[in-house]
Amino acid sequence: FGDELNALRAVVCEAIFNPELYKTQLNQAEGQDLVATSANNYYEGVTQAEAEDFYRAMADPADPEPVSYGLNSKLVKDEDGTIRERVWKVGGMYSPAIEKIVYWLEKAQGVAQEPQKATIAALIDYYKTGNLHDFDRYNILWVRDTVSNVDFVNGFIEDYGDPLGRKASWESLV
């Protein structure tokens, strides 16, 4: 572990102690590349302009129910310059952890009250597909459930760590 540990230590110490490296978690200063000047890992090798262009091309202005494009993904630029999303889902990025989330949601579904069973099923679908329309369906069911004795929040929800307001960190509470 000696060389690996020393290499890791060098990276960590640089990130912690170099005031020029990651000045702020979330830069919102006008006229600057907000992605390049913010300390997060939602965009790998991608500039603010490239990210904005990527999602602008994805959006369908005629869609009556547009989704929050990018909410559950990391945007990366490949060696050949191609920009793509790495979606957080079963079989995608963070799959082992998300598989555990699905496992426990399936357990909870077995003891949930009726309206909540459908809500949990929609959330499981979302984690399996990564499809943001499934996430919207889950959220609509969650909001409509006003009778279940136990409430919960679960998903890639908090977008305040992304300078572009697109990517969300995961949270769960019961």
Which ranges hold each PLM region?
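Fold-level signature of zinc-dependent metallopeptidase catalytic domains
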Residues: P19-V174
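N-terminal accessory alpha/beta regions
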Residues: F1-V12, I16, L21
